[in-house]
């Protein structure tokens, strides 16, 4: 019996050795070089797909009016460095006010969404409470509805609350309405809170920690990566929103950066027909660059902190 087992073991060792030899042969210098070339080509291809739209935007923004109006093909090279296009879109004096209102709406949307979704996620992460399954089913059912289907109800709430008057400060609350709550963000926080080992909560309560203190001092810091993810998604949604501000601010492009971009580059009066109004694409591209500039600045200032927070994992071992 022992001899037969030894024979089977030797055969197993020989098979493993052959497999190892094949692996070593497969990792020859030619295969490694081909793999490196393939990865480089793929990375360059997708890198160009990301960079090319920004390059095209910058080229068009620096092109003169004559070339933009007469060209019949895509502009891949500018006819000069017409930086005066940026000065022309800033002449109306509405850019800074639109940036300020947009920033205020974005910050307020992040704060309110974190407040509601963190509370929702933590509540549904608790083990048992009455009607938990019923409320969770109702919240998940909301995910079936598209965002456009909710606009009518949201607009009705804003009108009843009198938050749709652009000349009043309450318009800020009206602009933040669609971004205050999110079932998807609440689902993310629920999953993050449920991933915390139960022994941490048990140890905290043994040490005399109350429920609120445990939530603020232990549970919430441990879902920091989810907090940053929700904040980033909310910031992009609030900053790039167009349809909702268009409903509330039809004639006030100075209160939203995207409406300000839409209003730029039209050479004509309101009384003229569509054929008489010229659209200067270079001015629109210049305005678009100025619109995304604040987000780029914020990202480059906090990129290390954002990447560190998103990539971090909470320590689940009590020290």
From Swiss-Prot:
Domain of life: Bacteria
Domain ABC transmembrane type-1: 99-302
Pfam families: BPD_transp_1 (PF00528)
Keyword Cell membrane recorded: yes
Membrane topology of the entry: Multi-pass membrane protein
Its biological purpose: Probably part of a binding-protein-dependent transport system. Probably responsible for the translocation of the substrate across the membrane.
Alphabetically ordered keywords of this record: Cell membrane, Membrane, Transmembrane, Transmembrane helix, Transport
Protein name (database record): Probable ABC transporter permease protein MG189 homolog
First-listed, main subcellular location of the protein, grouped into a coarse class: membrane
Protein family according to the UniProt entry: Belongs to the binding-protein-dependent transport system permease family. MalFG subfamily.
Subcellular location: Cell membrane
Gene Ontology CC annotations of this record: plasma membrane
Gene3D superfamilies: MetI-like
GO BP annotations, alphabetical order: transmembrane transport
PANTHER family linked: ABC TRANSPORTER PERMEASE PROTEIN MG189-RELATED, ABC TRANSPORTER PERMEASE PROTEIN MG189-RELATED-RELATED
Transmembrane spans: 41-61, 98-118, 134-154, 169-189, 229-249, 282-302
């Amino acid at each position: 019996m022992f001899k037969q087992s030894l024979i089977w073991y030797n055969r197993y060792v020989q098979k493993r050795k052959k497999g190892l030899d094949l692996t070593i042969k497969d990792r020859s210098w030619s295969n490694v070089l081909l793999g490196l070339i393939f990865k480089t080509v793929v990375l360059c291809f997708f890198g160009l797909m990301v960079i090319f739209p920004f390059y095209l935007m910058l080229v068009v923004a620096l092109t003169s009016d004559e070339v933009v109006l007469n060209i019949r093909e895509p502009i891949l090279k500018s006819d000069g460095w017409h930086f005066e296009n940026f000065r022309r879109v800033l002449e109306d004096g509405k850019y800074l006010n639109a940036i300020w209102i947009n920033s205020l709406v974005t910050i307020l949307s992040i704060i309110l969404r974190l407040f509601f979704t963190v509370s929702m996620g933590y509540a549904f992460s608790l083990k048992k409470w009455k009607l938990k399954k019923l409320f969770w089913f109702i919240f998940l059912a909301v995910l079936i509805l598209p965002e456009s289907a909710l606009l009518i109800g949201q607009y009705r709430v804003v009108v009843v609350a009198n938050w749709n008057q652009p000349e009043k400060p309450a318009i800020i609350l009206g602009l933040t309405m669609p971004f205050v709550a999110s079932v998807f963000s609440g689902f993310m926080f629920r999953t993050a809170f449920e991933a915390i080992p139960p022994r941490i909560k048990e140890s905290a309560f043994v040490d005399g920690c109350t429920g609120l203190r445990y939530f603020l001092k232990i549970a919430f810091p441990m879902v920091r990566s989810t907090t940053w993810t929700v904040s980033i998604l909310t910031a992009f949604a609030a900053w790039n929103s167009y349809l909702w501000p268009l409903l509330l601010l039809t004639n006030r492009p100075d209160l939203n950066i995207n409406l300000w971009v839409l209003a730029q580059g039209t050479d004509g009066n309101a009384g003229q027909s569509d054929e008489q109004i010229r659209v200067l694409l270079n001015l629109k591209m210049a305005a678009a660059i100025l619109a995304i500039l604040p987000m780029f600045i914020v990202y480059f200032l906090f990129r290390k902190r954002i990447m560190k927070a998103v990539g971090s994992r909470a320590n689940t071992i009590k020290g």
